[in-house]
């Protein structure tokens, strides 16, 4: 089976705004932000280490946050031990070492996605984007999400 990958143009604005008109089908990714996230999860995004090139609007950030939360909740039980979360975050941060993501911030974002109340106000928005993209990719890989499963997850996040 041949894999089809869509390249995401670099240096352009990324938006999470849904286009007008009917959906192309169940599970179909409809936003630039969704396509970028899918490409990042498949290690096919133009900016693999850190924030994507160009402008990122709030709706794109929201799509990535929701997708990250969906993936985190698939990977961890709500009452997962902190040690399990810490080990998984450490592996992910190490895997994407070139992005220099702060481990504690990444761990707090995972814990917040699991419903824990943690202080997020001090986390830099660019760090949040990096965590929502790169550890998301690690979790998608760990869960062995196939192309269809990943597309469904991202499409669900776009609906938010």
What is each stretch, according to the model?
Residues 108-160:
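Amphipathic alpha-helical binding modules
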Residues 1-31:
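Actinobacteria-biased recognition of intrinsically disordered, low-complexity terminal regions
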Residues 32, 36-39, 84, 88, ...:
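Charge-rich, solvent-exposed alpha-helical interaction surfaces
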Residues 22, 26, 46-57, 96, ...:
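Alpha-helical rod/repeat scaffolding segments in eukaryotic adaptors/tethers
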Residues 42-78:
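N-terminal interaction modules that seed assembly of large macromolecular complexes
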Residues 38-55, 90-91, 108-121:
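Short amphipathic alpha-helical segments and their helix-coil junctions
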Residues 82-109:
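Charged low-complexity stretches with an acidic bias
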